[in-house]
């Protein structure tokens, strides 16, 4: 294994120290470790908090700043952040209007964020939750019960962050997050595995003519391992799966801060249909050249046009990664005029930065 690290035990500490030094708009907190906006808490605005195991950079710490997250909690590589990190970060960023926890649907994340939610409620913080489960590839896997939360998380953090920035209430921000989760669909493929530094070897092996179709962002298995032939055929198979697996009925939990209890709510993901307008994200899972991602986007635009989908905005690059995995994911999120206005609103974070 050749990686730009000193010691596998220091990877998280050193990368977070570098992030904070590169971006004075962020503050790195210690004991426990978490990252916040330098100006947090911001009075009069809902605070957004997310987190996960490290290895997915720039998610989530790279999305802290004006118009997006107020704070983020990084765990060790592919390991959920502990409840004390989440609790302390939320206490630090709460400006009095409440804290919204954005949680990707992985068993460890759910357990730890739910524990922190109850601790925050007991401490007098107005808090609620949104669970993200956009991966259409599999239901139930190594890390999850139900579908996995992947790159649509980035789009939701941007859009709900813009709503919080303009002064929307905690309930309105949470409702928007749940709506966007039901309108977003993602799928990924891998041509090569990632290497977790502590393991020192690739998490799986593929033959030269194979791909892992529907791979997870921790290297989890997908739908199947199938032959790899060409860019166009790969994008076609992914696009068809996004459309075919769009409809999804399940029950998700959220915290009702008024009742002080967990509530279960049946929800339905909406399949994409001709006439829909979308934000398209072509996401590098770690080691795929940008030139190849643009080739993917070229084919994706053709397939969207054929299906009657209008791409209103796009992102192409590394936004939700899996260390050094060779591969990519596609996310399509249904939008309307209001959603696009939130997307175009100013955002100033290390990884997304536009507007005044």
Model-assigned labels for residue ranges:
Residues 1-48, 208, 337, 345-356:
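N-terminal amphipathic/basic leader segments beginning at the initiator methionine
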Residues 2, 46-53, 69-72, 98-107, ...:
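Short glycine-rich or small-residue beta-strand-to-loop segments that form or flank ligand, phosphate
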Residues 56, 63-96:
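Glycine-rich oxoanion-binding loops at beta->alpha junctions
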Residues 72-77, 121-146, 310:
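Short, acidic/small-residue loops that bind anionic groups at enzyme active sites
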Residues 110-124, 143, 292-298:
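Short Gly/Thr/Asp-enriched flexible loops that form oxyanion-binding sites at enzyme active sites
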Residues 132-185:
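Short alpha-helices
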Residues 168-293:
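Mixed-charge interfacial surface used for oligomerization/domain docking
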Residues 259-356:
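C-terminal non-catalytic interaction/assembly regions of soluble proteins
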């Amino acid at each position: 294994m050749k990686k730009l690290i000193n010691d596998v035990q220091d990877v998280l500490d050193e990368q977070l120290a570098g992030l904070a030094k590169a971006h004075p708009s962020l503050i790195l907190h210690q004991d426990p470790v978490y990252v916040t906006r330098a100006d947090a808490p911001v009075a009069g605005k809902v605070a957004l908090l997310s987190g996960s195991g490290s290895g997915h950079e720039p998610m989530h710490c790279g999305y802290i700043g004006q118009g997006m997250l107020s704070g983020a909690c990084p765990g060790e590589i592919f390991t959920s952040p502990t409840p004390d990190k989440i609790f302390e970060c939320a206490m630090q960023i709460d400006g009095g209007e409440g804290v919204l926890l954005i949680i990707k649907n992985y068993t460890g994340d759910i357990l730890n964020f739910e524990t922190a939610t109850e601790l925050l409620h007991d401490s007098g913080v107005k808090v609620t939750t949104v669970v993200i489960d956009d991966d259409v590839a599999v239901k139930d896997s190594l890390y999850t019960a139900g579908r996995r939360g992947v790159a649509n998380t980035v789009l939701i953090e941007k859009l709900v962050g813009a709503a919080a920035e303009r002064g929307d209430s905690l309930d309105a921000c949470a409702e928007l997050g749940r709506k966007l989760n039901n309108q977003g669909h993602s799928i990924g493929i891998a041509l090569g595995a990632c290497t977790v530094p502590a393991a020192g070897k690739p998490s799986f092996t593929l033959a030269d003519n194979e791909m892992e179709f529907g791979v997870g962002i921790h290297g989890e298995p997908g739908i199947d391992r199938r032959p790899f032939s060409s860019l166009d055929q790969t994008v076609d198979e992914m696009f068809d799966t996004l459309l075919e697996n769009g409809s999804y009925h399940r029950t998700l939990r959220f915290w009702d801060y008024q009742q002080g209890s967990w509530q279960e709510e049946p929800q339905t993901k909406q399949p994409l249909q001709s006439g829909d307008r979308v934000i398209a994200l072509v996401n590098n899972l770690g080691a795929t050249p940008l030139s190849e991602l643009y080739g993917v986007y070229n084919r994706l635009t053709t397939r969207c046009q054929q299906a009657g989908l209008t791409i209103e905005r796009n992102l192409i690059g590394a936004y939700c990664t899996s260390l050094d995995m060779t591969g990519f994911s596609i996310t399509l999120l249904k939008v309307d005029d209001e959603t696009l206005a939130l997307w175009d609103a100013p955002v100033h974070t290390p990884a997304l930065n536009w507007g005044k």
